[in-house]
């Protein structure tokens, strides 16, 4: 076979191969090889004129290659100088073209190829097409709206590499070249004209162009488009958004290899916000817990529904129970019709309450509240001329006439303020602190915007099964977290240490936890603050335990467990039974004075259940224990004196004794020192116990006179020593008697003198 014929066959095949490679994703090495082949083709001579109908000619660059134009006319035996003076027709095809060339099968096949890809943005609504030239005709610019041109151009034997970032796009039935890849991709995916009438003719089906369909980023994806993504400070940026498998990927550009954002759809909640007077776009909001991680804007409702459909399919569980499909990713669809919301306004009361889901997502409730505010649009004109708070008050006043009086609404906010189970706390919402009025009721923590507005709540958390953990960094020492299954449900912050301790004690009781405030781990606080928190937490813990309804009928005395109560309690005397009978009679009448307040103490909590006789018995028990410890302390002190005296004598004997008995004496001295050390440790333990007993005795005596008690110390005379220590006086005790308060023995007061006791206290503080 002749070499020239082989070359004539090889050049078109190479040109076709390069045109196919333009539509493929190539590596860098392959791309370099392709450019090398293109440069070799550039050095070769142009093809004969019979193959011109197959090639694409970029007529915008014909002025730079007259030699190539002259070669085109060699086959037609025509002089180019005779054609230069002829006028040009810009909008019509050449009439002198031969019908054989016009009807050639190569031209018909070339019409099915994709349009050319110019280096510069072409004018709108037309592209350039090269046609074979007949004798006596010059090259012309031909505008067309219904045809397609071949795929590549060769100018002066030069192979032009098309830029894949300028895809061809067919919009509204017209084919044009786009120089913006994001506009091309988004518009080629679907029509964004959402305001067109339904009576119009249906638009042609939009398909992905071949250049974009072959992109590496959108391969094997469920859906993809260029969507607007909301940035941190409210700006919008167009990014390539792709859903592949169960993940949503965002690319800043179609040329990126790695996604800018990767989001797992099975761990997100999606909220669809339709376009209305407040929202200028159709939005899809993706949230994880209480954090908004992504906001995408769509240009039509149909596009939003299509994306939601794909998200439901992706989030669908592998196997549902009894054929019921429950998506792992809850998609919250809002009400789309405003008329429907206005009609519900006439039937339901006008309130600001928002339903709370299981995940207690503050963001989801806020969005639902925003969408539900469409029900108040009947007062839009009235609200437009005043502040938002004033409009809310007017709405609430109008809503009062629609509401029925409930039993819970009879309680005013003033009575709520007196209950220690409520107060102001700072709540962390969307990485910002907001002050909320918090209230505990029925094992649920309610959050209100104001203490005057108790009819509605912003959020509510069921506390059963939750845990509380103090600490949220060194900048927030009084903050604590509520956890459910080791995940944060809410982060709260108190104003001071006492307030923090009070809330910790109340929350522990409402959660049903067996952990006490002392057992919690506190960070970022000093010793004094820790003592204040634990003390307040202990008091509130005991108070909340006493207020729990553990009996089917109400009782006057609180059922508070004593912190170290013995199993065997002494028998209550007749006076206590009389008091108990009197209290039961008062229970039948159900007349309890709500203004009577009792200050509770942690160590003498049982006196509120058994009255003043219980406090008296506790005080006498502490007196007996105190005297017992003092006797043991005196015994140990006497033994220590004897041991030290014996050790002193042995040391004197060592100095004066010969060498034979020295070793035995040293061993005896070592034994005595060990005994002295053990006795000293025992004495220190007794000192600490004695201090604790004296403090409890003082607390019980401080509560006793408030109930009309008077406890005298045990006399040390021989005649009264044989009397029972815990006998109850037969005569009734005086109430609020100042003279009885002055009869307290000075021996009851704890003595803080002595260096040993001082050292023991310091050692105990360091140990804790």
UniProtKB/Swiss-Prot annotation:
Compositionally biased intervals (Basic and acidic residues): 587-596, 759-768
Expressed in which tissues: Expressed in breast, colon and brain. In all 3 tissues, expressed in the microvasculature (at protein level). In addition, in the breast, found in the contractile myoepithelial cell layer which surrounds the breast ducts (at protein level). In the colon, expressed in the mucous membrane and colonic crypts and in the smooth muscle cell layer which provide movement of the colon (at protein level). In the cerebellum, localized around the Purkinje neurons and the granule cells of the granular layer, but not inside cell bodies (at protein level).
Source domain of life: Eukaryota
Domain PH: 220-316, 418-512
Stretches of the chain forming a coiled coil according to its record: 611-700
Ranges where the record places region Disordered: 82-145, 173-211, 566-604, 705-768
One Pfam family matching this protein: PH
PROSITE patterns per record: PH_DOMAIN
Keyword terms of this UniProt record: Cell junction, Cell projection, Coiled coil, Cytoplasm, Cytoskeleton, Phosphoprotein, Repeat
Post-translational modification Phosphotyrosine, affected residues: 557
Biased amino acid composition, Polar residues: 710-729
Location(s) in or outside the cell: Cytoplasm; Cell projection, Podosome; Cell projection, Invadopodium; Cytoplasm, Cytoskeleton, Stress fiber
Biased composition (Low complexity): 177-190
Protein's job: May be involved in podosome and invadosome formation.
Subunit structure: Interacts with CTTN.
Listed name of the protein: Actin filament-associated protein 1-like 1
Lineage of origin: Eukaryota, Metazoa, Chordata, Craniata, Vertebrata
